[in-house]
Amino acid sequence: MKVLHVCSELYPLLKTGGLADVMGALPFAQNEIGIDARLVLPAYPAISRGIPNTVVVAEFNNFAGHVVLRYGEYNGIGVYLIDAPHLYAREGNPYHDMWYNDYTDNYKRFALLAWVGAELATGLDFWWRAEIVHAHDWHAGLTAAYLHHKGRPAKSVFTIHNLAYQGRFLPYHLTEIGLPWWMFNVDGLELYGEMSYLKAGLYYSDISTAVSPTYAKEITTPEFAYGLQGLLQTLKAQGRLVGILNGVDEKIWHPYSDPYIEDHYKLKSMQGKRKNKIKLQAYFNLPQNPNALLFVMVTRLTEQKGVDLLIGSAERIVQQGGQLAILGSGSAHLEAGINWLAQEYPENIAVKIGYDEALSHLMIAGGDVILVPSRFEPCGLTQLYGLKYGTLPLVRSTGGLADTVIDSSSENIKARHATGFVFNDADVGGLCYGIDSAFTLWRKPSQWESVIVNAMEQDFSWQTSAKGYQSLYDILLHK
C-alpha cells in the first residue's frame, strides 16, 4: 500500500503547531506496520537543510513557474521536496512574514504543493506512484480538487487538524492555479464568495478525518463549523467523516527516555519527577517547595486556548498556595495579561514569552497539573504528554480533550478510571471549578497517586492511530 502525505510542516525540521508533530510521527508509525508511506513538502530552507542529500525526480514548468522535484530520505522515510525558490526560499514562518502578514502569493504556493501531491499519483515519479493521497489541513486542501480534475487516479483522504484555518482567497486566482472556473461553485471550492482550500479538501476527498471522534461530531454544529456545517453534516450522513485520535511520539515524549530532561523516571520509580519539579521551580525563580501544587501551561497565547480564562482565574491558584508557570507567545494583550500576573504574584506565577522545546519538556516532566482550558481543541497533544508524564491534565470538555481525559470524580477514582480534571463551561467559573478540584485531590496524596497511575497507564501511541488509518485506507482501496 503506497500512501503519500501532502503537508507543509515536519517536526523537528519546521514546526508552527501540532501539525508538525503529527507529520513527524504518523508516517513513521505507518511504515512500521507495513505501509509504504512518503511525504511531499515545500523545500523551505529549514526542510532543505534537514534533508540535504536529494536527487532530482522531475523538472517542469507550470502555473507556478519553474519547479524541480527532489527526493531524499529523512530517518528512513521517503520525502519529496518541491524546490521552487521564488515561492519557498523564505526563512522563518512558512505562512507569513516577520510582521505577521500572510504572504500574498500563498494561494499559489499551496496550490503548487497540492498539484504536485496529485501528480505523484499519476506518474510524476516514474518509480513510485501513490495509491492513497492523504492531504493535511488547508495548505494541502486543493490536492483532492486536482485529483478530481484528473479523473481520480488515486483515492484521497483529507485530515482536518483545525477547521478554523480555511485557506480563503479571492476567486480570480482560480485562473492562476490550473483549475477550471466551473469548480468555483457551492458544490466545489466556493465558500461565501471566496475560494476555500479547506473546503476543497472536504468536498472532493473520498473521505475526511478529524483528529478526534468528539471533534468530528462537534464540527457538524454551527458553533464549531465556521460556516461549513451543511457540508460536514452531509459528509457525516454519507459516512465520509470520521474521527481518529492523534498519538504520542514515544521516541520524543517518554519520561524514561526523554532526550531533553536529565532526571528520567517511570511509573514504579518517580524520584526523577520530583527532581524535575525542583529544577522547574528554580528555572522560573519560584520557591522550591515540593508541597506547592505546580500548574504548568505550554501553549499559543490565544483565546482559543483559553488563556483569557486562566488570566481571570489565576488568583484562585495563588489563594490556595499553588504555583503557575507559563510558556508561550501569541496575542499581545494576552502576553501583557500574563506578564502582569507574574509581576503581581512573583512568588506564585512565572512566565516565559516565546517557545523553548527543551523547557517545554521540563515543564511537562516537572509540573503537577498541565492546563489545557481550550474553547475548542481538535485533538490536543499537551494533555497526552501530561498523561504520559504523570502530570495530570486539567481540561475543558471539548474535542480530543473530552476523548482522552477522564475527570477525577469520586466515582471515577473509586473505579480507577480517573486520569485528570474536566470542566464544562468555557468561562472563568468553569476553570476555577477545575482548579479547586485539583487542589482537593492534591490534599489526598494516596488518591492523587492512584490517578497518576491511571494516567501513565493510558495508551495513546501512534501505533494505535496508524492502525486506524490503515483500516480506513483498506476500505477505500476495496471500494
Swiss-Prot record:
Taxonomy, superkingdom: Bacteria
UniProt keyword list: Glycogen biosynthesis, Glycosyltransferase, Transferase
Gene Ontology MF term list: alpha-1,4-glucan glucosyltransferase (ADP-glucose donor) activity; alpha-1,4-glucan glucosyltransferase (UDP-glucose donor) activity
Catalytic activity: [(1->4)-alpha-D-glucosyl](n) + ADP-alpha-D-glucose = [(1->4)-alpha-D-glucosyl](n+1) + ADP + H(+)
Enzyme class, first EC level, given as a word: transferase
Pathway given in the UniProt record: Glycan biosynthesis; glycogen biosynthesis
Binding-site positions, ADP-alpha-D-glucose: 15
UniProt GO BP: glycogen biosynthetic process
Its EC number(s): 2.4.1.21
Gene Ontology cellular-component terms listed: cytosol
Stored InterPro entries: Glyco_trans_1 (IPR001296), GS/SS (IPR011835), Starch_synth_cat_dom (IPR013534)
Pfam families referenced in this protein's UniProt entry, alphabetically: Glyco_transf_5, Glycos_transf_1
SUPFAM superfamilies from the UniProt entry: UDP-Glycosyltransferase/glycogen phosphorylase
Protein family according to the UniProt entry: Belongs to the glycosyltransferase 1 family. Bacterial/plant glycogen synthase subfamily.
Function description: Synthesizes alpha-1,4-glucan chains using ADP-glucose.
Stored NCBIfam families: glgA (TIGR02095), PRK00654.1-2 (NF001899)
PANTHER family in the cross-refs: ALPHA AMYLASE DOMAIN-CONTAINING PROTEIN, GRANULE-BOUND STARCH SYNTHASE 1, CHLOROPLASTIC/AMYLOPLASTIC
Protein name: Glycogen synthase
Origin species: Histophilus somni (strain 129Pt)
Gene: glgA
